């Protein structure tokens, strides 16, 4: 007799069957894949024993080379060898072309303004290039683990916006891979150390990779990882150290203008010199020119430190700002976790130790810690650890809100709110008989829409034609675990609703976030004054419109003298509303309110008389 195996919905019918899932650190410079096997978490090496895969893709006429093979050709064929593609994810072609850094690639522009790489195999976008990096990692994992993966957790920088996160998901989708979750890189590091060390308290995650810098302050308590605040710079990393060293070598050798091939050769040598100076006080830089001549120079640790010191100071300044956002001091931080290969640079470790007052944690390989944390999370999400009560709470970097009358911003979800999150707020109509309402979703900390970032617009139609203020529209903001935002507006009496998922076309850099936060503090007093003025102007418009309608209907309840006084006061309110004195507008509205109270009472009495006309007491 056949037996039916019964399981809870969403759980495996074979509770002891180990499901295959991995964590992937899709890095700017290098990428890794890790898995939990026999209770141990480790990164998976390739056939040559290499754990990290260079995030480099080269397109030839017939093949696509990825990793070390592509890196070998990067100096000879820089135009078709795409390096650090993560920096292009979610950015517009205009952003790239107007940036400070030049690239050897030939670009084309897509219909939505995003960059396309011109290659021997045609046009490819950053999502497709990212998929080529994921492909060998997935193949490596399936070969090592002996089966098809049931899901992956991919890490992204904490400041990746919706477009960049969606692009990462799309890269996996091109390979038919199920993304269990996108995980912020600092949070992944916290998982790796939190589960291993069982720490409780406040920790800082200092993540300096090849192309991005993230600083996150987290509170760890009984398996709960709560991100208190995040900061950083999406255009600062080890690649920038390499470029500074490359320029230094170029100046010492007096090379002047150089072609892209020699520039790439210099960059490769600069990276080697940087790595050598991790353990040595000096090293020799050497390159061979096209004519066969050899150039040499000694580069000391002091030279290197002098070059990169301004960038390292920028990371410390970000740490200081983020601690302030989190409401904690450096002394309250129990441990500082170092993430990313660039944290191996001695000056970085020295500055971090000096700022936080204690040596940073480096017990887990900083190159592998993110992938290890992602693997632990993947193992939980795929159902191998149903007993785990691990909870992840990330935060949104900038407040989300709705535009209201007068160009004001009504914040619905505040900055640094933990995600996933859902927040709802009720709005109403401004005019009598209004049957539609336009919604403008914005992002930022300022009081006026003009000073915030526009995310999306949508319209709710089918609102019952009621008096102004009578309809109730509930607007719900939902931010999921991947940081993607959905906004829904619903009219409560009819249930009619409209919604939109916000996926900005263009990326929002950490520099822009920092600027928006600085501006919100710099202009706080002025913004409050402007908001108060706009609020009084909107209130004046509402009162005047309502009163005009009342006078048109029941103006005969007033004598000529009373009507004249009200008209004069209304004219005064209208005139003041065009000015910039919020208090004067407020006082004029209050005088108008006092002046029309008797008129309002007469209207009420008249309405009652009309309603009860012809009715007997028994009927009432």
UniProtKB/Swiss-Prot annotation:
One of its GO terms (molecular function) is unfolded protein binding. GO terms for biological process: iron-sulfur cluster assembly. InterPro entries: ATPase_NBD, Heat_shock_70_CS, HSP70_C_sf, HSP70_peptide-bd_sf, Hsp_70_fam, ISC_FeS_clus_asmbl_HscA. Keywords: ATP-binding, Chaperone, Nucleotide-binding. It comes from the Bacteria. SUPFAM superfamilies: Actin-like ATPase domain, Heat shock protein 70kD (HSP70), C-terminal subdomain, Heat shock protein 70kD (HSP70), peptide-binding domain. It holds the Pfam family HSP70. Gene3D superfamilies: 1.20.1270.10, 3.30.420.40, Actin, Chain A, domain 4, Substrate Binding Domain Of DNAk, Chain A, domain 1. Chaperone involved in the maturation of iron-sulfur cluster-containing proteins. Has a low intrinsic ATPase activity which is markedly stimulated by HscB. PANTHER family: HEAT SHOCK PROTEIN 70KDA. Belongs to the heat shock protein 70 family. This is Chaperone protein HscA homolog. It comes from Shewanella sp. (strain W3-18-1). The gene is hscA.
